[in-house]
């Protein structure tokens, strides 16, 4: 399961993200980098939870900034 989720994030980074032309993530590391690290470090369940929680924070009303994987 973990490998499938990592593959999905990598596919997003390779094919979907470049279509946006301008980087839109307000965080460092980017949300996709964060998701990859969380999945690799914590596995499918907890890594997915952390990634989704981070993506939900990525909106215009959040200040963003440096937010590493715990």
Swiss-Prot record:
InterPro entries, sorted: Membr_insert_effic_factor_YidD
GO cellular component: plasma membrane
Subcellular location: Cell membrane
Coiled coil: none
NCBIfam families for this protein: membrane protein insertion efficiency factor YidD
Function: Could be involved in insertion of integral membrane proteins into the membrane.
Name the UniProt record assigns to this protein: Putative membrane protein insertion efficiency factor
